[in-house]
């Protein structure tokens, strides 16, 4: 999915959520909603992003996913069975692209519910597959591609 000119919501603005938000801003996202249970984290992240991307439209303090092209769960919600959903699923459009950073299970309850609504989804382990080649290159180790890692992976949910 090309992010240029699109809208996105990132739920969870810690380290992973901050990196995702910065990547989205760098990719040309037009509108970005930041939500964290600690609103100060969202506002500090927004201030840092605004310094580098002054035309980025930012929103805070709501985890209402209505009207976003992209929705990312960057919280630990979904690591344990019975965790609450990060957003109200009734408000997620079937046209929304939904990603989750949780690695513990390939298809979290959140992703399963969004997929059942017709959303295109991206599992958390895909994030890891994209990071591994960069780590290997950084440490001057023999590298591979994210696609090759996907081919070799034996993921059990």
Question: Where do the protein language model's features map onto the residues?
Answer:
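Hydrophobic Val/Ile/Leu positions in short beta-strands of Rossmann-like dinucleotide-binding domains
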Residues: 10-11, 34, 100
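NAD(P)-binding Rossmann-fold cofactor-contacting core
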Residues: 29-52
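Short acidic low-complexity segments
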Residues: 54-68
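Short glycine-/small-residue-rich Rossmann-like dinucleotide-binding loops
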Residues: 75-78, 102-103
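Rossmann-fold NAD(P)-binding glycine/threonine-rich loop
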Residues: 94-148, 152
